[in-house]
Amino acid sequence: GHIYGPTITETDSRASAQFTQNAIEGEDIVMKSAGMQMRSYCYVLDCASAILTVLLNGKSGDAYNISNKASVCTISDIALALAHAGGQKVVYENATDEEKKGYNLMSNSSLDAAKLEKLGWRACFDLEEGAEATVKYMKKLRG
């Protein structure tokens, strides 16, 4: 899944990282599409606990999807959550033909974490809580 949280760097080019940068810098988030592609997002602390769960309870050699079913949403949804957490808004603009060339055309890349959940793992942060924690902590780090 797509891991987000206060671990992003200023050079991180992922959409969620750019949205976070906008939110903590007091800028509106500009979307160059409707952002209707579905993605699996997972807050970084939930990701860490998922990895620990696999290390403690998983079967060696097996693969496990890390995904929070409460945070499977559109790209627009995460933009709105981060904008709200930062007191900003999301603005939708038309993309140039050049910008459209870089789009990921996959409409749904959400993951199923049922196998991980069978090991006893549960996410603690929904999308709004993760967005709030991310923006709050990043603002504190930046002073």
Language-model-detected regions and their locations in the chain:
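Glycine/proline-rich active-site loop of Rossmann-fold NAD(P)-dependent oxidoreductases
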Residues: 4-18, 27, 32, 44-45, ...
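An acidic site on a long C-lobe helix of protein kinase domains
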Residues: 15, 43-47, 74, 126-127
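C-terminal lobe/hinge of AMP-binding adenylation domains
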Residues: 34-36
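Non-catalytic, hydrophobic alpha-helical segments
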Residues: 47, 51, 66, 75-78, ...
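Mid/C-terminal beta-alpha module of Rossmann-like enzyme folds, strongest
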Residues: 57-101
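Amphipathic terminal alpha-helices
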Residues: 127-143
